[in-house]
Amino acid sequence: MSRVGKKPVTVPSGVTATVEGQTVKMKGPKGQLQFVVHDDVDVKFEDGAVKVAPRHETNRARALYGTARAQIANLVEGVTKGFEKKLEITGVGYRAAMQGKKLQLALGYSHDVLYDIPEGITITVPKPTEINVVGIDPQKVGQVAAEIRDYRPPEPYKGKGVRYADEFIFRKEGKKK
């Protein structure tokens, strides 16, 4: 059994945490986030740390309190450091560029793909083959990166497409004559 939930989440200086019922709110230098904890989990703020505990000794409650603790730790990291996902584009003629508040992707289709950047997310294009997705909410950052990758996922023969910077593409060999 994992013991992630037993460790309290320390709130660093410069971050204010409030617990109202089942809602945990964090406010820091990068912004404000909140998370609603499941009813099977007790949440308290004491001694500069947020503590979670299962309300009942059921398997579900024990699983949820570890998850709740990890989510609260993500709130703290988000409002202090933020989260970033890096994407790489591989392929001849494949490139990305910013067009106002939209991301323009040339991915081998007959048209360019325009991606509307959601609220709370910052996208930068340092090179035409690199995309950085930055934000304070890890779920939103991951979702945006996944949506961009889904426009042209990497294919296993030449590796062309949009991939995460740390992703390994299993390569296949072509047909034999």
From Swiss-Prot:
GO terms for biological process: cytoplasmic translation. Pfam families: Ribosomal_L6. This protein binds to the 23S rRNA, and is important in its secondary structure. It is located near the subunit interface in the base of the L7/L12 stalk, and near the tRNA binding site of the peptidyltransferase center. This is Large ribosomal subunit protein uL6. PROSITE patterns: RIBOSOMAL_L6_1. The gene is rplF. It comes from Rhodopseudomonas palustris (strain ATCC BAA-98 / CGA009). GO terms for cellular component: cytosolic large ribosomal subunit. Part of the 50S ribosomal subunit. Coiled coil: none annotated. InterPro entries: Ribosomal_uL6-like (IPR000702), Ribosomal_uL6-like_a/b-dom_sf (IPR036789), Ribosomal_uL6_a/b-dom (IPR020040), Ribosomal_uL6_bac-type (IPR019906), Ribosomal_uL6_CS (IPR002358). Belongs to the universal ribosomal protein uL6 family. Keywords: Ribonucleoprotein, Ribosomal protein, RNA-binding, rRNA-binding. One of its GO terms (molecular function) is rRNA binding.
